[in-house]
Amino acid sequence: MKIGIPREIKNNENRVGLSPSGVHALVESGHTVLVETNAGSGSFFEDVDYKEAGAEIVAEQAKVWDVDMVIKVKEPLESEYPYFKEGLVLFTYLHLANEEKLTQALIDRKVISIAYETVQLPDRSSPLLSPMSEVAGRMSAQVGAEFLQKLNGGMGILLGGVPGVPKGKVTIIGGGQAGTNAAKIALGLGADVTILDVNPKRLQQLDDLFGGRVHTIMSNPLNIELYVKQSDLVIGAVLIPGAKAPRLVTEDMIKQMKNGSVIIDIAIDQGGIFETTDKITTHDDPTYIKHGVVHYAVANMPGAVPRTSTLALNNATLPYALMLANKGYREAFKSNQPLSLGLNTYKGHVTNKGVAEAFEMEYKSVEEALQL
């Protein structure tokens, strides 16, 4: 199989689809890998590293897309849509429930798109989303602490406080991978941390994990309102695989927050959980202020720490990439049900229910679309 690794073009997206070690594994399995010039430089992997791993370095973006399978990090941008072709396998993060134009382009060009975030194991965990959720969760507490500083628009709060001065209050909505990792860093910074989740069993697990050092609260509209309005930092970390994020924090709740408080919407690439995060921001211009509250809505947070993120992502995605390359997508889906759940579009059909519902499009199951 011929595989392409394009350079990411999203604002300040410095990750790359595969590290040189991942490329080497594919080449050793008998596949041809084309890597776009400087694709890995943002993660401090040079072209020579890929060449030594067995890749062919190509300068033309069109050439790196003219392959059997493209492995990326983030969803393609509009300038990349012309490279779509029937039968192309696209393996990347897609978050299509918040991307109607991209979804339509994939359907129109009959692309076989496999989204990292909807690959799901029997225990409902997301093995290809998990490493980036860990990174984004940990970053969210660090970023929140930074933007609470007065010089960054915040109210001038030190999360850990000092003797005689209260700690900063951090509320995390969602107790999954991202929320749990946000709590770890917030606790490490000395904050007073509360996690809200809808699953009592998960709250029990979090209580055990943190030894009672965080407040674990059932998530419902009244509790969300109560804790949001008294918080200095609110982190949104709710995920429904493949579907749009629920808008759990209303504009009225935001209006009740203190001036200079901060919200971090980790779920912004799925639409966000705050009614007031009405636009996606970038690493170049990461925040805006609405109702006196600092809003951080960067959709590719892990892109700011690309070396760590690329290596962690490569560890997770490589076994699936090898499966797709070695077996072909049909046999790979037959033999690996979690991978088949990653299929979002197939030759003109939407094969993810959450995406179909988001845009009122016709849905076909993977089995029906592929006639497995």
From Swiss-Prot:
Recorded metabolic or biological pathway in which this protein acts: Amino-acid degradation; L-alanine degradation via dehydrogenase pathway; NH(3) and pyruvate from L-alanine: step 1/1
Species in which this protein is naturally found: Staphylococcus aureus (strain N315)
UniProtKB keywords: NAD, Oxidoreductase
PROSITE patterns: ALADH_PNT_1, ALADH_PNT_2
TM spans (from-to): none
Active-site residues annotated for this sequence: H95
An individual GO BP term: L-alanine catabolic process
UniProt keyword DNA-binding present: no
Function field: May play a role in cell wall synthesis as L-alanine is an important constituent of the peptidoglycan layer.
InterPro entries: Ala_DH, Ala_DH/PNT_CS2, AlaDH/PNT_CS1, AlaDH/PNT_N, AlaDH/PNT_NAD(H)-bd, NAD(P)-bd_dom_sf
Lineage: Bacteria, Bacillati, Bacillota, Bacilli, Bacillales
Superkingdom per UniProt: Bacteria
GO cellular component: plasma membrane
UniProt family annotation: Belongs to the AlaDH/PNT family.
EC primary class: oxidoreductase
Catalysis performed (reactions): L-alanine + NAD(+) + H2O = pyruvate + NH4(+) + NADH + H(+)
UniProt protein name: Alanine dehydrogenase 2
EC number(s) from the headed UniProt entry: 1.4.1.1
Residues bound to NAD(+): 169-199
Coiled-coil region(s): none
